[in-house]
């Protein structure tokens, strides 16, 4: 594809007609650095879409005329960097192109107060209004498939996600982690203004945040006053330093697993921001739903794609049921049940086909626990108070450090009520019966009556939903996905998109 530079808004439509492809859009204000390069190269490697970089210094984002005049302008080098790192086209409009004089159709937007009044919004009055206005204008001109943004400007990222949702814009936001320079400070177009001594101060500020992140993993708490004291001792001018919820930007709560430690300081005439995410444990995805909804297949694929542990809690109940049958133990007798808990070992192991096998007391029972015989009793056994108590404790032990995706019927309500993402995956009884029939026929040649399967599923649903202990219900904060008419991969992609929207990419960096 021929690389092009577009300078007029009216040329955008002509260019779009000629490319016959979806667009990845990377908006910038120029003076490109390695952070921008990471955005462009990520877009290039993500898919086969056309990559469009814009270079526009938006006057509405500046509350200080001198700051606008002093903003670095390196257009020739920016063009070279963009094209050499994967841009197919560059859009370099003028102020008059973006904000035509006397054009009453331009929509000047206000950023949501709940997100824009904290952090940078405290002193940069109108800044985020300007961001919303220009991005809304650009998105409506370009109509990209994907919008690539950096997590360095986390508050801005939250505000733009809100904009896309509120204005019902058909674009997916893809974020990349904060990119840091050789000395640990976040890459910024304003770094060129720093003297050697000022850069030293920024480095100290960033290192204190990173040290706080490291300490938080051990101590699970943060002492803001101690950090402020250290920064003040270095004569660093602190604009703000806050410990907040990463999505609401309200004060962090004790129960928050992921929180945001964000600060802004001034070095001479230059104002710079940095942040880290604090985590008590790695994220957890909880997927609940009725039998035959596709939970196991979906959860396995999500675990593989996100490199998370796959915790099949249903298999644990089935494994225990299998052992009770094998040992001919009457599960209605509490004493015998308690005795078997002392000796049972349920272990998951990856096999040579990249699948997970289930072992009970060193015996592989992967296939046996999926038999109709086990299916007919597992709901009854899983409703026994002592059984649930024992296995929930085992599941929580596995999840103490997080980093897993678990599926079952009470994951989001009982086992991991503080999971970062809760999904309630379901489908119609007809759809679930068809899936079960297909699944069983692929494993054996025995003909299975569809109506019989429907009856069995309805019976299992009733038992699961009406049991006294941990019934199958949708958690209040769970997102329901009805999978009728969707492929497995479409459901998986939907859940991964929801995960990426909730979990900052930076949390994946060790």
From Swiss-Prot:
Q: Which residues form the active site?
A: 36
Q: Where is the protein found, in the record's own terms?
A: Cytoplasm
Q: Name one GO cellular component term.
A: cytosol
Residues binding (R)-pantoate are 61, 156
Q: What residues does ATP bind to? A: 29-36, 150-153, 187-190
> What Pfam families does the annotation carry?
Cytidylate_kin (PF02224), Pantoate_ligase (PF02569)
The positions annotated for binding beta-alanine are 61
Domain of life, source organism:
Bacteria
Please give the Gene3D superfamilies that the UniProt record associates with this protein: HUPs (3.40.50.620), P-loop containing nucleotide triphosphate hydrolases (3.40.50.300), Pantoate-beta-alanine ligase, C-terminal domain (3.30.1300.10)
Cite a single GO BP annotation: nucleobase-containing small molecule interconversion
The main location is cytoplasm
Q: Which residues form a coiled coil?
A: none
Region annotated Cytidylate kinase sits at 277-510
So, what pathway does this thing act in? Cofactor biosynthesis; (R)-pantothenate biosynthesis; (R)-pantothenate from (R)-pantoate and beta-alanine: step 1/1
Q: Which InterPro entries match?
A: Cytidylate_kin (IPR003136), Cytidylate_kinase_dom (IPR011994), P-loop_NTPase (IPR027417), Pantoate_ligase (IPR003721), Pantoate_ligase/cytidylate_kin (IPR024894), Pantoate_ligase_C (IPR042176), Rossmann-like_a/b/a_fold (IPR014729)
Q: Does the keyword Cytoplasm apply?
A: yes
What family name appears in the similarity comment?
In the N-terminal section; belongs to the pantothenate synthetase family.
* Protein name, as recorded: Bifunctional pantoate ligase/cytidylate kinase
Source organism lineage?
Bacteria, Bacillati, Cyanobacteriota, Cyanophyceae, Synechococcales
Name of the gene this protein is made from: panC/cmk
